[in-house]
């Protein structure tokens, strides 16, 4: 039930893999990877984009190599609308959509989907409620009809609300005993202390207990609307036919009274190192997260920071962090860095799981690597390896319909342009070591770190 931190800043990634944040486990190569043929990547000539009169944006790309189709998307209704007293309401509402509608109960909805091997699921992040589904192309009308039915006329039957509440509370109880989850949540509370991103989207036990069935009905009535909704459809269907099906299922939906989401306040950066520890008795492992706030996805520093992060703690055996903390010193079960970027401010952090007796030693090594990263940046060879890996893995991330759907949502969410993936290799290769160094120095300040530890 607990959610990884990148979900908070990158709501779309709940339904699809962000191809701009590629994992790095390729064999090192000092040569540039060959550029994929531009015609094989999504681009303006094969991405269909249209906005319906009611505000729904559809992006579609045909792929007739398999008989299936994927839908992914989001509605502008996330936890930013939650009050502190009922935090988790957006997620509770999203997870309750499939529990019954005005026309059918839960069993009837799932029986209809499972009878043709289709699936549909929902969840919520800070900014959006997200959905993901798949079916055979011939069953796309059924999939879209189900989507329309549950987002427009959910019933939230009381029996199902209480069952869902019990499941959510169980998930939160598990989270409270998970050292990695608690370290991640505590890190957010430090870095985003005076910002909405400090709050976990799935709430706390007391806030979930406070939510009533009528709260779900009210949240849906107020905040679910077609304006700002985005749907990506990829697979064995012509884009024009996909558009006609979306128009048929959702074209007459409207909610003109939906309010805009509250604007994100500016983030106040840390002025000193803040260390916070969460005690969880009976554990044999401690998890720590050390880091800072990071760039938003549209910031100019994002791509240099992403390439630098690959060197710091992703590429090969988890980069410099993995080599120093795990391979050479043997202090960690795992150690890596991550760059989480979305609509608002992101985070740049190093995570490690260690023996509780090794927390101080591992923390010192990580802080030493941060200081070295900020002082010297990356070498030309390290950057070249990272660039080759980014470029070489892009086609792999776009081999599946789900990967392409994620790419289309990425383009729309962050206004990257329909030709973004055709330009991607050139953008990556244009980054210089100095740009990586400047990005590192902008965000990492070794004397101003957030350090979160959870364990015995």
Annotate each predicted stretch with a short phrase:
Residues 149-156, 249-257, 368-377:
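A common structural junction motif
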Residues 236:
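Carbohydrate-associated surface elements
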Residues 5-9, 29-84, 99-141, 162, ...:
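Non-catalytic beta-strand/loop surface segments
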């Amino acid at each position: 039930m607990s959610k990884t931190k990148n979900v908070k800043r990158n709501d779309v990634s709940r339904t699809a893999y962000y191809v701009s944040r590629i994992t790095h486990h390729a064999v090192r190569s000092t040569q540039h990877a060959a550029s994929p043929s531009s015609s094989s990547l999504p681009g303006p000539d094969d991405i269909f984009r249209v906005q319906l009169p009611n505000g729904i944006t559809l992006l579609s790309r045909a792929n007739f190599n398999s008989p299936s189709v994927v839908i992914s998307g989001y509605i502008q209704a996330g936890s930013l609308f939650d009050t502190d007293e009922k935090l988790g309401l957006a997620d509770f509402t999203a997870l309750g959509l499939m529990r019954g509608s005005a026309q059918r109960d839960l069993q009837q909805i799932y029986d209809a989907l499972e009878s043709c091997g289709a699936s549909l699921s929902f969840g919520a992040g800070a900014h959006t409620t997200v959905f993901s589904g798949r079916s055979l192309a011939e069953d796309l009308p059924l999939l879209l009809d189900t989507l329309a039915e549950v987002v427009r006329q959910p019933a939230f039957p009381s029996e199902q609300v209480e069952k869902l509440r019990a499941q959510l509370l169980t998930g939160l109880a598990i989270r409270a005993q998970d050292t990695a989850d608690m370290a991640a949540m505590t890190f957010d509370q430090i870095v985003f202390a005076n910002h909405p991103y400090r709050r976990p989207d799935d709430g706390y036990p007391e806030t979930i207990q406070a939510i009533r069935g009528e709260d779900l009905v009210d949240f849906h009535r107020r905040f679910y609307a077609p304006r700002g909704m985005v749907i990506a459809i990829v697979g064995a269907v012509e884009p024009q036919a996909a558009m006609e099906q979306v128009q048929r299922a959702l074209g007459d939906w409207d909610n003109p009274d939906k309010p805009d989401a509250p604007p994100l306040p500016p983030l106040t950066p840390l002025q000193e190192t803040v260390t916070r520890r969460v005690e969880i008795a009976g554990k044999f492992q401690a998890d720590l997260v050390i880091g800072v706030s990071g760039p938003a996805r549209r910031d100019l520093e994002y791509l240099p920071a992403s390439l630098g992060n690959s060197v710091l703690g992703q590429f090969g055996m988890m980069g410099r962090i993995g080599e120093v903390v795990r391979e050479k010193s043997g202090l960690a079960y795992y150690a890596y860095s991550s760059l989480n970027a979305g609509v608002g401010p992101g985070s740049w952090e190093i995570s490690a799981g260690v023996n509780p007796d090794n927390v101080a030693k591992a923390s010192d090594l990580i802080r030493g690597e941060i200081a070295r990263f900020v002082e010297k940046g990356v070498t030309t060879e390290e950057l070249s390896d990272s660039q080759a890996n980014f470029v070489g893995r892009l086609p792999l991330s776009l081999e599946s319909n789900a990967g392409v759907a994620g790419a289309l949502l990425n383009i729309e969410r962050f206004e990257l342009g329909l030709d973004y993936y055709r330009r991607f290799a050139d953008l990556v290769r244009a980054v210089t070591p100095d740009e990586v160094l400047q990005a590192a120095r902008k965000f990492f300040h070794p004397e101003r770190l957030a350090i979160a530890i959870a364990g015995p």
